Amino acid sequence: GEVVFDMCAAPGGKSTELAAKLNKTGLLVTNDISNSRAKALLKNVEVFGVPNLCVLNEDPVGIASRFSGFFDKVLIDAPCSGEGMFRKDNKLIKAWEKNGPEFYSQIQKNIILAGADMLKPGGKLLYSTCTFSKLEDEDSVIHLLTNRPDMHLIDIKPYEGFCHGFDTDEGYHLEKAVRIFPHKMSGEGHFVALFEKDGEDYTSSKRPVSGKTKLPVELKDFMDNTTFEYDLSLIHI
């Protein structure tokens, strides 16, 4: 099964959707750097009853230093200035005045590079925000493509109301990214970009095919790279 990482997962809606897609196969690792939000994340995924799950409360950059090239797929719903949500929540306007796009841009650039580093060759990374700011959207994409030349943008299945990313005519193919505007389709403002890492397709890599008495390779690799002690009697395969 696939090994999937939800980097900025709280409160857990995306993680439960990913868990449903995995359908009790592979491994889902979810993380949030905020202690309080990680607790909410843990509570929500426990209610959902996800059996193949590990919840972390760590800095993504630190995780990347231990799990380089580990995940088949990475989801980054990045912390952002929230411009796309102003219509829904007026409190976000006050938050934007305190910490605007410039504040979040550096955070996003760090975590998008960390996400790429944790991705296997042939794996896919989805980067999203709920802001209109080019600084947080297309500029984050350019930062990744410039610093990780083994990453490239791929097309996202079009839907009515989707708009292309703001292209710069500099060869980055930013038109493959998607912008969602509330006056174009139902919902709030969002930005989405899908990347693929160069190299052998991860689906062709060797996977464990048998041995019910043994831990799946992807789970054992993860446990071997953590500092926690696990009670194997509580792990049911």
Regions found by a protein language model. Name each.
Residues 1-235:
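S-adenosylmethionine
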